[in-house]
Design a protein with these regions (language model features):
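N-terminal glycine-/charge-rich "phosphate-binding" loop or analogous flexible N-terminal tail
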Residues: 1-25
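Conserved beta-strand positions in the Rossmann-like core of class I SAM-dependent methyltransferases
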Residues: 5, 47, 109
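Active-site flanking residues adjacent to catalytic metal/cofactor-binding acidic residues
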Residues: 7, 26, 49, 130, ...
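Short, charged/polar "capping" segments at the starts of alpha-helices
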Residues: 11-16, 53-57, 137-139
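Rossmann-like dinucleotide/phosphate-binding beta-alpha-beta segment
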Residues: 26-98
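Rossmann-like dinucleotide-binding domain for NAD(H)/NADP(H)
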Residues: 99, 109-203
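Glycine-rich nucleotide-phosphate-binding loops and adjacent flexible coil segments
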Residues: 103
């Protein structure tokens, strides 16, 4: 979706380093906890919100409002439900710190994209990293490189220098695909052998 030079010659703001920043996770399942471990390695303070708290989460659980108010970075790692559609909205953005960073590698409809655009334009949101998009189905899974993007909301996002959009394939590495295949096969073998299912999802 967007080409980024490997080396961008400019003066970087060294006051925005991650150390001692508050990184807030919405969703503390396996992926959220892995991300928390990475952030902890950078010396970040890890806070989390999840209706189903995990004893394996190494950070501190807080309410959603407290998370929004304290966040330097908000990263979404939760499934999409009827209750959390547009979790990031004009209302929740208004509760955030000025300059907050938002990361979404989960589900596009967790974010009201127009509200995100408004927050970015006003400076309330400092930057966004998106591997998913609210209307991605008709845009992300075919090659439109020779066509004009008619989705004005997405076009606005892509044009912003403080936004990175990838087409729901940031995971697409040789190592990740191999791990997915191995885990899937092992899940089948464990199921049919009557073994413990380490990746079981209760519905």
């Amino acid at each position: 979706m967007k080409t980024i030079a490997f080396f961008d010659a400019k003066s970087y703001d060294r006051e925005s380093l991650a150390n001692f920043r508050n990184d807030e996770l919405i969703g503390t399942g396996k992926i959220g906890r892995c991300f928390a471990d990475i952030c902890e390695g950078f010396g970040m303070n890890i806070l989390g919100f999840d209706p189903y708290e995990s004893p394996e989460f190494a950070g501190k659980y807080v309410t959603l409002d407290e998370l929004l108010e304290k966040s330097d970075i908000i990263s979404l790692h939760c499934p999409l439900t009827r209750e959390n559609k547009h979790l990031i909205s004009d209302e929740t953005i208004s509760k955030m710190k000025k300059g907050v960073y938002i990361i979404n590698t989960s589900r596009g409809q967790l974010i009201d994209t127009q509200a995100l655009n408004n927050g970015l334009k006003s400076g309330k949101i400092g930057a966004a990293g998106l591997d998913v998009y609210e209307e991605e189905t008709s845009l992300f899974f075919e090659d439109f490189s020779d066509e004009v993007i008619t989705d004005d909301t997405l076009s606005t996002l892509i044009a912003m220098p403080n936004v990175i959009v990838s087409s729901h394939q940031a995971f697409l590495t040789k190592e990740a695909l191999s791990a997915i295949a191995e885990t899937t096969v092992k899940n089948f073998l464990d199921y049919f052998s009557g073994n413990e299912l380490k990746n079981e999802i209760s519905v």
